Amino acid sequence: YRTANVRRKSGNMSKYICVFCDERKESDTAHLINGKIGICRHCFENLDKTAYASPYQGTEHIAFTMSPFEYTKSMRKVILDLKFSNCKAYAKLLADMKNYLDSYDIWDTFDYIVPVPLHKKRLRERGYNQSELIAKEVAEYLKIPMRTDLLIRTKATKKQSSLVRTERVTNVQSAFKCTEKCDGKKILLFDDIYTTGNTAQSCARELANNGAEQICALTLAIHVQIKLPIIAY
């Protein structure tokens, strides 16, 4: 993905570059940022949708979760560029794929959207929280206030992607802390990827323990090997 990123930063940018197929395209799409990068019509129409674009069953502290796209090789490339190659414009681009949210009239029930926080050490290293950047765009679209101060990460955890499933559970246990009570609040928790769900569950447990009435989770993509029952909402 780094080689592709170098190509995007160099050369003539009179035509935009599709961040998924990495090809130079004519302006055939509304999914375009600053006239330079975007998602071409073909890639957008062929994004791997999941059954989890509808609300699916949550966990002990999560009422339901939504994950509209599969975490495919191309989606992984774009998210990694956003995370590690300082391609912050991709956050707006990814959030621009939010038309799938329009099918549901549940969003005005939430008091806050809360992005999963980074530990301050990792935030200093990276310079930004990619989930927060995407959540900001989604929050503006859904007209839900975003709170980045309600939940903090107190434990410098290892990267979940580097751990086996059993290690991921203990890695994020007691890793988050609420900065204030949230009695009776309905909170939409946002993260970029749903893998095992341990990070979201750890966040939700802390929010619930501090009085949140309901926590739901929204992620951009999900590993398709995750099997969860679909629920009607």
Language model region names:
Residues 1-190, 195-233:
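Glycine-rich phosphate/pyrophosphate-handling loop used in enzymes and phosphotransfer proteins
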